[in-house]
């Protein structure tokens, strides 16, 4: 187990995930390799008893098992809903896909490391405290080094829809939070985006509500792409924004009962909410895989010619 952890750390270090992005960009490959060796030697050296008392099991779980994660807000009901939602989505992923995530992880932004996660669900509340600048710097680094955050304002999309004269309190809070990170231009998911095809074929991404668009990093037009069936695979959007209260649609009790009704009450809407969650998770984990896969018919046709 210890060797597996060291191997995982070495991979993360060499990829720059354990370094600030500015440092990683300037670090030569040879220096990175040397640093990784020194890091390994330091970790396998005998440590004082106090250091050995660290929660190794928790570290192993984060490093060696894919886990969906959510941000703790301090609101017990919201946090319980986030946990129950990711439990429900995890169970759905295990049942319908080859992915078998571990138990969802609750993330305290002030103390927990983000480097081990690719998917982070962040419900935004009207009374949320904007994290301090140093914490948001950590969030910004996470987003710039391969992580994706799903911000959910849970307000049915009234917050984000263009043309509204007033935004919801949740959206105003989200804007204050995002002021501390480098947010790319955003757009509603276009019909040809890989998110619409990452696992299921989808035309919308509902949650408990269904009035909100799903916003992602805007894709630049590629004049050489032609009539491509999917775009957006090469670079995974570091930020996804919805107002559809996704976690509430996914949330299940310990005995498997749904905790919240969809609005309107429609079993099909809940099924589509789960499928939306699957596509988002697969997109954050696989990136351009599905964008390549959907081109296979065209490639085979050209090979035949």
Regions flagged by a language model, labelled:
Residues 60-63, 112-116, 135, 142-144, ...:
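Extracellular/periplasmic catalytic domains that process cell-envelope and extracellular macromolecules
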Residues 13, 97, 147, 178-185, ...:
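A generic secondary-structure signal for well-formed alpha-helical elements
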Residues 1-51:
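C-terminal signal-anchor/stop-transfer transmembrane helix together with its immediate cytosolic
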Residues 64-67, 157-257, 263-274, 278, ...:
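An acidic, glycine-rich "communication" segment
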Residues 51-119, 126, 246-247, 254-256, ...:
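Aromatic-Pro/Gly-enriched surface loop or interdomain linker
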Residues 77-169, 211, 242:
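Helical hinge/lid and interdomain linker segments adjacent to catalytic or ligand-binding clefts
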